Amino acid sequence: GGISVDDSKSGCICHSSSPASDLMVTLSGLPATYDAGVRYNLTVALSGGPEVTSNPTNQGGFNLEASAGDLSSVDSNTQEKEDGSLTHNSEGNDQRSWKVEWVAPADDSLRVSFTLRGNAVNGDGEASEEDHWNEAEYTSKGSGYEEESPGLSTILTIALLLGIACRRRLRY
């Protein structure tokens, strides 16, 4: 079970050809600003999408990637992939909400990006256009993160160009 990262990069196309606006994929518990090395309990949730048919199994799945830090499973409903991403497993595809853990990187100067892809299915056991998927991007900045500002060389280059432009105007 589970969604591979390669499959999920273009969406969950085995379930539907394009993302569905009626399906919300959310990652809660992620701090806007993280502290280095701290463990954060996160919840992946799907809302909307197709109604589950008479069979309440096979309701959905997800794939979560982080650009830094470590994602890990906290129960038997998710699994860690070799590339460091997390996904649901066969036990975890009978639901639309999962608990996971993220350990923030030791470097608190980073801006960490998260990509969450999820699919909500109708439970009929058939991959079809009736199943929906969507994706969302999230970020968390380290407590030591600093927005990039123009460096001195950039400022000097701009000043030089302005000086040349002004000098040329004065010659005419």
Where are these regions (language model features)?
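Sequence context surrounding c-type heme c attachment/ligation sites in exported
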Residues: 1-148
